Amino acid sequence: MSSEESGEVGVPKNGNQDDDSGSTRVSVSDRLAKLQRLKRKKQESEKLNKQELFQDYKQQKLKSIEYKKIEQKKLNAELEQEKLDSIEKGEDFERKQNWDWTIEDCEKWEKKTKQKGRNQKSGFQNFNKMAEQAYNKELSNLKVDKETYDQQKNAINKNKSGNQSQMSKILPVSSKPSAADTNRLVRNIEEANNRRMKRRRNKDDENDVNSYINDKNKQFNLKLNRQYDES
C-alpha cells in the first residue's frame, strides 16, 4: 500500500472524528438549552399558580366579609322588626329580650363586664403600686439620726412652757435640714435619675436588636445579658 493510498484513507477518518465531536457538542448544548427552557417554564408556571391561589384566597376572603356584613344586616333588621312589634303590642322589648337569657349567659356577661372594668383600672393601679414600692424602698434606705432627734426633742421639752405659740416658733427653726441631709437628698435624686436613664437605654438597645428568632429566644438572651452585667 502506497503513501497516497494511506493518506487518502486517513483524511476521511479524521473528518469523521471532527463530525462526531461536533455533533456531540451540538447535542449537549441542545440539551442544556432545553433544560433551561424547561426550568423557565416551571418557574413561570409556579409564579402563575401562586398568583392564582392568592387571587382565589382574596376573593374567598372578600366573599366571607360580604357574607358576614349581609348576615349582620339581616340580624339588625330582624331585631328592629321585633322591637317595632313589641312597641305596637305595648310590651317592654328589653324585658322580653332578657327572657331568652339563661343563667350561664348572665354569668358570662357579668364576668365579661367585671373583667373589662378591671382592665380599665389596672393601668393606674400598677403605676400607683410601682410608685408606692419605690417610695417605701427609698424610706428603707434612709438612716435615722437618733442623736439629733433626741437633741431637738430635749430642746423643745426644755423650752416648753405650755404656750402653743412659743412651740410653733421653735419647731420651724429646729426642723431645718442639715447640709448632710440636703446632700443625701440630692444624691438620691441623681441615683434615681441614673437608674431611670439606664433602664431607658437598655430598652432602646433591646428594640434595636432584630436578630432574635422568636420571643422566647429574646427573653432568654436578655436574661443572660442581665446575669453577665450583674456578675
From Swiss-Prot:
<feature type="compositionally biased region" description="Polar residues">
    <location>
        <begin position="151"/>
        <end position="168"/>
    </location>
</feature>
<dbReference type="GO" id="GO:0000974">
    <property type="term" value="C:Prp19 complex"/>
</dbReference>
<dbReference type="Pfam" id="PF08231">
    <property type="entry name" value="SYF2"/>
</dbReference>
<keyword id="KW-0508">mRNA splicing</keyword>
<comment type="subunit">
    <text>Associated with the spliceosome.</text>
</comment>
<comment type="similarity">
    <text>Belongs to the SYF2 family.</text>
</comment>
<dbReference type="GO" id="GO:0006397">
    <property type="term" value="P:mRNA processing"/>
</dbReference>
<dbReference type="GO" id="GO:0008380">
    <property type="term" value="P:RNA splicing"/>
</dbReference>
<keyword id="KW-0747">Spliceosome</keyword>
<feature type="compositionally biased region" description="Polar residues">
    <location>
        <begin position="211"/>
        <end position="224"/>
    </location>
</feature>
<keyword id="KW-0507">mRNA processing</keyword>
<keyword id="KW-0539">Nucleus</keyword>
<dbReference type="GO" id="GO:0071014">
    <property type="term" value="C:post-mRNA release spliceosomal complex"/>
</dbReference>
<keyword id="KW-0175">Coiled coil</keyword>
<protein>
    <recommendedName>
        <fullName>Pre-mRNA-splicing factor SYF2</fullName>
    </recommendedName>
</protein>
<feature type="region of interest" description="Disordered">
    <location>
        <begin position="144"/>
        <end position="231"/>
    </location>
</feature>
<feature type="coiled-coil region">
    <location>
        <begin position="30"/>
        <end position="89"/>
    </location>
</feature>
<comment type="function">
    <text>Involved in pre-mRNA splicing.</text>
</comment>
<dbReference type="GO" id="GO:0071013">
    <property type="term" value="C:catalytic step 2 spliceosome"/>
</dbReference>
<dbReference type="InterPro" id="IPR013260">
    <property type="entry name" value="mRNA_splic_SYF2"/>
</dbReference>
<feature type="region of interest" description="Disordered">
    <location>
        <begin position="1"/>
        <end position="30"/>
    </location>
</feature>
